[in-house]
Swiss-Prot record:
The gene is mtgA. This is Biosynthetic peptidoglycan transglycosylase. Pfam families: Transgly. Pathway: Cell wall biogenesis; peptidoglycan biosynthesis. It catalyses: [GlcNAc-(1->4)-Mur2Ac(oyl-L-Ala-gamma-D-Glu-L-Lys-D-Ala-D-Ala)](n)-di-trans,octa-cis-undecaprenyl diphosphate + beta-D-GlcNAc-(1->4)-Mur2Ac(oyl-L-Ala-gamma-D-Glu-L-Lys-D-Ala-D-Ala)-di-trans,octa-cis-undecaprenyl diphosphate = [GlcNAc-(1->4)-Mur2Ac(oyl-L-Ala-gamma-D-Glu-L-Lys-D-Ala-D-Ala)](n+1)-di-trans,octa-cis-undecaprenyl diphosphate + di-trans,octa-cis-undecaprenyl diphosphate + H(+). Its EC number is 2.4.99.28. Its main location: membrane. Keywords: Cell inner membrane, Cell membrane, Cell shape, Cell wall biogenesis/degradation, Glycosyltransferase, Membrane, Peptidoglycan synthesis, Transferase, Transmembrane, Transmembrane helix. Belongs to the glycosyltransferase 51 family. Peptidoglycan polymerase that catalyzes glycan chain elongation from lipid-linked precursors. It is a single-pass membrane protein. InterPro entries: Glyco_trans_51, Lysozyme-like_dom_sf, PBP_transglycosylase, Pep_trsgly. Gene3D superfamilies: Biosynthetic peptidoglycan transglycosylase-like. One of its GO terms (cellular component) is plasma membrane.
Amino acid sequence: MKAFIVRMLLIFIGAILLIQLWIFSSLVWWRTHEVDTTMFMRIDYWSDPSEPIIHEWLDYDDISDNFKHAILAGEDAKFIHHHGFDWDGIRFALERNNEEGEVVAGGSTVSQQLAKNLFLYNKRSFIRKGQETVATWMMERMWSKRRILEVYMNSVEFGKNLYGVEAAAQYYYGKSAKSLTREQAAFLAALLPDPKYYQDHRNDRKLQYRKRVILRYMNSTQIPE
């Protein structure tokens, strides 16, 4: 019995180490190569292979600065200054959730969201959060802030099977993300908390309020050069 427990423990530790090696090697490759798929994209495809994934890569310099400012205003205003974790944001989210008695606010940074999108799944659990933390830590030490934001903008979800700002700009506005206006950029950034719902409810009051807030603060965000 003792030998069996030791063997199972070694298998578990080995599996954990293999996952970390996979994440590490993926981050090394993606540091200089386009990210053409993520775990979230795969999950969407596996759930319904008849629905194609809509995704198109766009280099950082070809994405409108309006969108870069908007996405940080909406998701992570301290992006430039933290090292993957916004402890003030996490503390605020915990306080909000404690007051409401349920999860109504997150504290995830762009880096944490990207780690989850690339390697994990959406269901909340302590195991997933722990792995997200490790992947975020590795990413922040291997990639520049510019690269993190570039990959994030190209892989985040904007609707059903719709990934990346270029695909979103073409879908919602029939134009490239290179020429997004402030209003258009703010709208796309405002979709992110619940893109599949807002895709069919574009006049939702919460969405419109979030868009106005992003417009108000987007010029105060600092983006990577």
